[in-house]
Design a protein with these regions (language model features):
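Formylglycine-dependent sulfatase
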Residues: 2, 6-8, 22-216
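Bacterial N-terminal signal peptides
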Residues: 9-18
Length: 216
């Protein structure tokens, strides 16, 4: 039942606060909202974590500690088997198939999949007074800036300019991470809405190295 209390608490805090302003004589302090950590790992098996599988050969002491202090869900299901739609569903609470992406995943140059104005769990929590951050792989698209009067192809991206419609415009106060998968171009790190260092070379596809899919 702890999960229900958490859900109700997040929703009830604004209402409780507004009621307390009407009853100024009430000195009862509002409960402190809990910290929330959401980890989405690619290609992690159900039995990889010791908390779920005592015979696992992978040490996971921190995750085990989090599991013992919280609730373990033993019959949970993802709404997709691949990265992008899973992330879309997680952040928006919608079935992934309701997005414009009907198969596969986005690239590092794709436009935003989360529609402008669409509420996310990040924007919802931000409106409740939370400070929100996203660290790691985004893989939901954003708008790159392009060199003026160019053909607006991948080679024409202006990495010196800020990105638009990325994580910080979808509810997150802070972002540090990569556009898509590690093996997907462009290989740059983004902090908030700007690259941390301008790319200085291009590597084309190389035979036998499947991780470099379409060059840098």
């Amino acid at each position: 039942m702890k999960t229900l209390r958490l859900t109700y608490q997040l929703i009830a805090i604004p209402a409780a606060f507004s009621l307390s302003t009407c009853h100024t004589q009430s000195s009862q302090q509002q409960p402190t909202p809990p910290n929330i950590i959401y980890i989405l790992a690619d290609d992690m098996g159900y039995g990889d974590i010791n908390a779920f599988n005592p015979h696992s050969q992978i040490p996971t002491p921190t995750l085990d500690s989090m599991a013992s202090a919280g609730i373990m869900f033993t019959d949970a299901h993802s709404n997709s088997s691949v990265s992008t739609p899973t992330r879309y569903g997680t952040l928006t609470g919608r079935y992934a198939f309701r997005s414009s992406l009907k198969k596969g995943v986005l690239t590092g140059y794709s436009s935003p999949l989360i529609e402008k104005g669409r509420e996310t769990i990040a924007s919802f929590l931000s409106n409740q007074g939370y400070q929100t951050a996203c660290i790691g792989k985004w893989h939901l698209g954003w708008d790159w800036a392009y060199i003026q009067n160019s053909q607006r192809k991948q080679k024409d991206v202006d990495f010196s300019q800020p990105i638009k419609n990325g994580p910080t415009e979808r509810g997150f106060d802070y972002f540090y991470g990569i556009p898509a998968s590690l093996g997907t171009a462009p290989h740059v790190y983004i902090e908030n809405n700007k690259v941390t260092a301008l790319p200085n070379r291009t590597i084309g596809p190389q035979k036998g190295i499947k991780l470099i899919r379409n060059g840098v």
